[in-house]
Design a protein with these regions (language model features):
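Extracytoplasmic gating/loop element in the C-terminal half of outer-membrane beta-barrel translocons
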Residues: 656-666, 843-909, 913, 943-946, ...
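Transmembrane beta-barrel wall of Gram-negative outer-membrane proteins
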Residues: 272, 297-376, 395-423, 582
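Solvent-exposed loop/turn elements at secondary-structure boundaries
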Residues: 188, 529, 576, 587-764, ...
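A short, solvent-exposed beta-strand micro-motif common in secreted/extracellular proteins
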Residues: 70, 98-107
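Periplasmic N-terminal accessory/gating domains of Gram-negative outer-membrane beta-barrel systems
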Residues: 78, 84, 88-90, 107-266, ...
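C-terminal beta-signal and terminal closure region of outer-membrane beta-barrel proteins
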Residues: 889, 926-968
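Gram-negative outer-membrane beta-barrel transporters
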Residues: 707-853
């Protein structure tokens, strides 16, 4: 159940009121309640920008009926309106590709034109004009464009336009690496990620599955696992990449407040091409400085990408095609004395994207986009290496498609409607195939051979959304909603966990540990134990995610804008029905000149529960997969080194661990007495987050903008699994002996017996997280041949469980909450990111990205199950008490990446660029994973706080990439 502290009593009451309302309002009723607002609704959607302002005469009187138009220089897109009785106007939902010419005219006054007005996604530019009969007396004030202070919103974000995207070193040209210049972003490495095709990260104090991806206004999320973006976008197809870290308006939801907004390029009235060849040579890279190996492990990449766009019908229809092909070869070293060598993992990826923009008429535009993302990795996370032989390799596959169609209709000069429909297929969304399905053989300390764990999962999503924008007087209203239907599931859990062909573990003596004896020479007499999985391994889950919102950006005075919103989210997979999220923000233009803005905000945001949680309840539930295990001589023990054809008749099934869903007491009562469990929850709930911020934005000089903000984030009801059939509390002090498993089991509410259950886990919403930060961004827009972004965050994240990370068992299941309160494993007190570029003489460009971050914590464990509860996460006793959670600290993480580029003009329109990039230039030891096993004594083991091997634990050493680029 959700918990809250007394300072947040008003939140509890708000949710209680919402629950009463929700009991009496059906979905249709909810729509009817909000319907009157549909004629009062917005300014722009996430993939467009807007302009608004006031037209006055020299005496300050409003000019009624003045003509205002915006014309795109590249596409010919044109829209116009007239001012109302107060001289106010607004032109909304303007595409971002290219710049605009804004024209203002009225009979008897000199007309005024503004060239090169560049808009930002989801931002309204204020353009106020004072017209006069003499053009020299015309005055113009502009805020909210790409080069100006944002004065209409409290939203915190960092934006990269197409030029900044080009001039940022992006490792492997992966789109998700573009978040690195923002200091509020932290790497999520070490939290169970396997998606090496993308950079996984967190925003502020959230979890790695709590970031929303938005592509051209539609969802880019994968509701099945929420690991990363559903379909990657070729880098050359991006028009804008914006990270929204806080104070999001009501149109954003289903996350703890953070979002990544991607806007793709559209074609223009001229043909454009952009073709890139990239090569990462293995011979130039350094050995990772933290590696335990004495040799380099080459990581070779060849990439071809391209983009071609142009007109089909000038000023009316434009197209864009983009593609990217990757071929990566990464070696891992097999160190076992049994068969030392090198295993080459191969990674292939193909990205395709097509976009079509068509002006149906002067009031209606149509946009269609198609994406395809396909990859295969033959050695994910370098699983083969060390003592793991090539026969244990698995192929990791993913194939995703997305198609989106949107239509924008200008219903009147002040009302615009935008409708979208999207289809997303992940077929498979995740697939693990053993390279050679076979029984696994484990020779302790020597080798692991063979693999039979497999997974094949799919996800099909359909989204329909509609947003109506309406401007009336000083109000810019938005009303909208969307519905997503997701159907996912398949065979296995996310990474595969069942040895369907069995696993033999050999003895620790004799021939089993002799590297001179091949595994094929061993016999059943050398085996110490055996296990094999049986049972149901499939699951499917269908769910709806739907939402409605209303937002009013009210320009209360000429210098004060209030952002008022309300959002409702519903995820049918959970039991939460009162997810109302109010949003409030303000932006105050201090001096009225658009150069100093004070802003603040507060809002409530609900996180989505990933659909593959169902795998835990079905595959790991009472009727799911179970494992038979036996030692030599036991009932049913195999007579040869071959898997069993079926569960052995008459063999006992030892008490097993299961996971059950909240709110299903009647169903589970047929398996055990559920009333004996400790705090079985009656509902599966969505975690919710309170976000607040206050800060200032100041234009220090032309093109120099400084942002300083305090950010507070409090997440309540974090979902985590907990053993509700845990043994009694076992207090450990110095010298206290370990409790045996048998003694612990005797104290469980439901006593474990053969064919029964031991650990009975359920998802409970009792986790909490608090994040406090000061975020500073100094942005120098491009001028005088250089651009610069300095981003610094001072922060502290404390939680009682790590969101979206595996291994969430507490030290003792009877002591959670304040007993588990500690630093997040992703807590970094300081993080600095400095990025930019400088145009040098002779057509050279030099630039780079430097990131410096404090050390991350790691959890310290004893390495033994001291309380006998079946979870080997017990923390050691230090100074007469159990050490706190995540009490260890690693080493600081530094990375300096630079590039040097030279451009050659082949013809007037054709340019060739040659570029060299170096990543981790100084080969700093950036270790992610730490060995946290302290031991059970008073002094740590020799291996404590050392770095395990493998790419999951160490960032790459120094690497070089070279590019050739042809543009026209």
């Amino acid at each position: 159940m959700h918990t809250t502290n007394s300072p947040f009593e008003f939140v509890r009451r708000l949710r209680g009121l919402a629950e009463i309302v929700s009991r009496n309002i059906t979905r249709a009723g909810f729509a009817l309640v909000l319907l009157p607002f549909s004629f009062l609704a917005s300014a722009q959607t996430p993939d467009t920008g807007s302009i608004r302002g006031q037209i006055l005469d020299p005496n300050g009187a409003a000019i009624v009926g003045a003509n205002v138009s915006a014309t795109n220089r590249l596409t010919g897109f044109h829209r116009q309106t007239t001012t109302n009785e107060r001289g106010l106007y607004a032109i909304t939902n303007l595409p971002l590709t290219g710049s605009y010419k804004v024209s203002v005219s009225f009979k008897g006054f000199a007309a005024k034109e503004l060239d090169e007005v560049v808009l930002r996604a989801s931002v309204t530019a204020d353009i106020n004009v004072t017209l006069a009969p003499d053009v020299t007396r015309t005055e113009v004030t502009v805020t909210g464009t790409s080069d100006a202070v944002k004065s209409d919103s409290a939203q915190l974000d960092v934006r990269l336009d197409a030029k900044k995207i080009e001039e940022t070193p992006v490792f492997g040209r992966k789109t998700t690496n573009l978040v690195l210049p923002m200091s509020a972003i932290r790497s999520a490495r070490g939290t169970g990620d396997l998606f090496l095709n993308n950079f996984l990260f967190i925003i502020d104090g959230g979890g790695r599955r709590q970031t929303n991806f938005i592509i051209d206004g539609g969802t880019g999320d994968d509701s099945w696992g929420r690991q990363t973006i559903f379909t990657n976008i070729p880098l050359s197809a991006l028009q804008e990449f914006t990270v929204l870290t806080n104070s999001l308006s009501a149109q954003y939801g289903r996350s703890a407040g953070g979002a990544v907004n991607l806007v793709t390029k559209s074609g223009t009235n001229e043909n454009h091409g952009d073709f890139v060849g990239l090569w990462r040579p293995p011979g130039l890279q350094a050995r990772p400085p933290a590696s335990t190996l004495n040799q380099r492990t080459p990581d070779q990449l060849a990439q071809l990408s391209g983009m071609f766009s142009g007109p089909i019908v000038k000023d009316h229809t434009h197209f864009l095609l983009a593609a990217e092909f990757n071929d990566q070869k990464r070696d891992s070293v097999i160190t076992t004395k049994l068969a030392p060598g090198v295993f080459r993992g191969v990674y292939h990826q193909e990205l395709l994207m097509g976009r079509l923009d068509h002006n149906l008429n002067d009031r209606n535009t149509l946009t269609a986009r198609f994406n395809f993302d396909n990859f295969i990795d033959s050695n994910p996370q370098d699983a083969v290496g060390g003592n793991v032989l090539a026969s244990a390799a698995r192929n990791f596959r993913r194939r995703a498609y997305a198609t989106q169609i949107s239509e924008t209709a200008v219903l009147s000069p002040s009302i615009v409607n935008e409708a979208r429909f999207q289809v997303q297929f992940g077929s498979p969304i995740t697939k693990f195939d053993p390279a050679n399905p076979s029984t696994q053989f484990v020779r302790p300390g020597l080798s692991t051979e063979g693999e039979s764990r497999q997974t094949k999962l799919t996800n099909h999503q359909y989204q329909i959304s509609d947003t109506i924008s309406f401007t009336r007087g000083k109000h810019s209203f938005r009303f909208g909603g969307d519905a997503i239907h997701s159907f996912s599931g398949g065979t296995g859990t996310e990474f595969g966990s069942a040895f369907v062909l069995g696993q033999f573990t050999f003895k620790t003596t004799g021939n089993s540990v002799n590297p001179g004896v091949s595994t094929t020479s061993l016999t059943i007499g050398d085996v110490a134990s055996y296990q094999q999985s049986f049972g149901t391994m499939t699951y499917n889950i269908g769910e709806w995610l739907w939402a409605g919102f209303v937002q009013d950006d009210w320009k209360a005075t000429r210098n004060l804008t209030l952002n008022l919103g309300l959002r409702y989210d519903r995820q049918t997979y959970t039991d939460d029905r009162n997810n109302f999220g109010p949003r409030f923000g303000f932006a105050y233009n201090l001096r009225g000149d658009g150069k100093s803005v004070v802003r603040g905000s507060y809002g409530i945001y609900y996180s989505e529960i990933k659909a593959n949680t169902e795998a835990s309840f079905t595959v790991n539930g009472p009727t799911g997969v179970f494992s038979y295990s036996a030692t030599a001589g036991g009932t049913g023990f195999p007579k040869s080194l071959a898997p069993l054809p079926a569960f052995p008749a008459g063999a006992p099934l030892p008490a097993r661990d299961i996971t059950i869903r909240p709110g299903r007491a009647t169903y589970y009562s047929q398996f055990f007495d559920i009333t004996k469990l400790k705090g079985y929850p009656d509902k599966l709930l969505n975690p919710y987050t309170q976000l607040a911020s206050v800060g200032v934005e100041r234009e220090l000089a032309p093109k120099w903008i400084l942002n300083v903000d305090y950010v507070w984030q409090h997440t309540i009801g974090i979902d985590r699994t907990l053993d509700l059939n845990s043994p009694s509390l076992y207090i450990r002090t110095a010298g206290t002996p370990a409790r045996s498993v048998a003694a612990a089991n005797a104290t469980r509410p439901i006593t474990p017996v053969d064919n029964g259950y031991r650990r009975i886990l359920s998802v409970v919403n009792n986790g909490e997280s608090i994040y406090n930060a000061m975020q500073l961004n100094l942005n120098k827009r491009f001028s005088h041949d250089f651009s610069l972004l300095v981003s610094y965050t001072l922060s502290h994240t404390i939680n009682s469980v790590e969101p979206d990370a595996p291994g969430g068992d507490p030290n003792d299941a009877n002591q959670v909450g304040r007993f588990e309160r500690g630093d997040s494993i992703l807590d970094q007190r300081h993080r600095v990111a400095v990025s930019g570029w400088w145009n040098l003489p002779y057509h050279f460009t030099f630039g780079g990205l430097a990131t410096l971050a404090s050390a991350r914590p790691f959890n310290i464990t004893a390495g033994s199950d001291l309380n006998g509860d079946g979870a080997n996460v017990d923390r050691p006793v230090v100074n007469a008490s159990v050490i706190g959670r995540n009490a260890g600290r690693g080493n600081p993480l530094y990375d300096v990446s630079v590039f040097l580029e030279r451009e050659f003009r082949v013809t007037e329109r054709v340019r060739l660029s040659l570029r060299g990039e170096s990543f981790n230039l100084f080969n700093h030891a950036n270790t992610i994973g730490r060995n946290g096993v302290f031991g059970t004594g008073t002094t740590p083991l020799p291996t404590f706080n050392t770095t395990p091997g493998g790419v999951a634990n160490v960032d790459p050493g120094r690497m070089f990439e070279f590019q050739g680029r042809l543009r026209f």
